[in-house]
Amino acid sequence: MTLRHIRQILKNTDFIHTGGSAEELKVAEFLKSEAEAMGAKAWLEPFPVQMADIKEAKLIVDGREIPCKGYKNCGSGTVEAPLVYIPAQDYITLKAVRGKIVLIDGGLRHFGYHDMLEAGAVGFITYDGNLNFPNRDIDAKELRSFVADGKKTLAVNINAKDAQKIVLSRAKTAKIAVEEDEYEGESRNVVAEIPGTSDEWIVLSAHYDTVPLSRGAYDNMSGCIGLLETMDKLKSGAPHHYGLRFVFCGSEERGLLGSKAYTAAHDEELKNVVLNVNVDMIGVPMGRFVACVSAEETMVGFIKYFAGARGWSVNAYTGVYSSDSTPFADHGVPALSFARGTPGGQGNIHCRYDTMDLLSDEQLREDGDFIADFTCFMADAVVCPVKREIPDKIKDDLDKYLNRKR
């Protein structure tokens, strides 16, 4: 793609588009049209998602109202109780939460959430933002279904500056009130394909949705551009031995919902998928290129050699990446995620500062070209050299990441 085309894609998607929203659908249709313009067959695959509209959310701490946003899908009601801040969720601090509203660092995660409920917590306050940022933004969070696991509790999110004030003031009581309307909505994956000469496929994935505060240029329209660059480069050599399927995943930021929906709906077809190549955040001018491999260890060495022969530096390692490669690996498909991480101070995600200004069009194209070269090598292989098996260590990491074990 030309640099002008890359910049135009960033401009055309320069707005917040959260999972399940009308704005997400607008971006999905745009990506579909981009794929079709490159000569690929493309379509949308919808899937259901839990949605909620917050009608009212209030947090009163020691008689003073604190700006907040209610957690979507946490239920409706009011709770008033003593307030406690806990810096960890271990057996020591959990003794202090019974009958109390709990202020915590970080988000509500499955085991920590249920540990606090079992210890008697009656409500939750989380926070985000940064003490050093000039804004007082508050992210719109949700109580994810796989976190709640059927047990809803009122929760609100506040800004980091107010969280610090609450702790410094040694606040004693809190009152949370949330009123919401919950309903089932629809997100969708955008799927495009370039058939090969065999009945086996390589699936490339990248999510296109954003969090509520972010326009998502870096996280992750950059990854979508990486897929489009790969599509653009490989279409001229088609058909390759392996077919190429491009999946632009919806609702990744809500818990990998798009890739989970895709792998569940195509479970039988995944037997013919030899590799998943996921792209999540590339194109920043500073920072190292990484490859997280959820497959056999020898693939790490192969990627290093492949990159080194092209003068390309890469930090390759095995593990489970917090992105759309994970559901593929969990379904037995060898998977890897490519990314270019920013050094500290060079960019932030999941906030208002994730804009196209973070990105270099030239670096986006260079990163995309490397991913395309790697994919082309694999697509033209007589036999995909990666064993179609997931090592036990990766399986264990998947169980932990997906909340099946601690």
Give residue ranges: language-model regions.
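Metal-dependent peptidase/peptidase-like ectodomains
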Residues: 199, 239, 249-348
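Soluble metallo-hydrolase cores and metallopeptidase-like ectodomains found primarily
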Residues: 62-91, 139-217, 229-237, 241-243
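His/Asp/Glu-rich mid-to-C-terminal helical/loop segments that flank catalytic regions of hydrolases
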Residues: 232, 345-406
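Second-shell loop/turn segments in exported
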Residues: 14-22, 70, 103-106, 151-153, ...
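Noncatalytic luminal/extracellular "stalk/propeptide" segments of secretory-pathway proteins
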Residues: 3-98
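Acidic, glycine-rich active-site loops and adjacent beta-strand->loop/helix elements
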Residues: 107-108, 130-131, 182, 208-210, ...
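N-terminal capping segment at the start of a domain
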Residues: 1-23, 38, 132-137, 142-144, ...
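Structural recognition of the beta-strand scaffold that forms the well-ordered cores
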Residues: 101-103, 123-126, 155-157, 191, ...
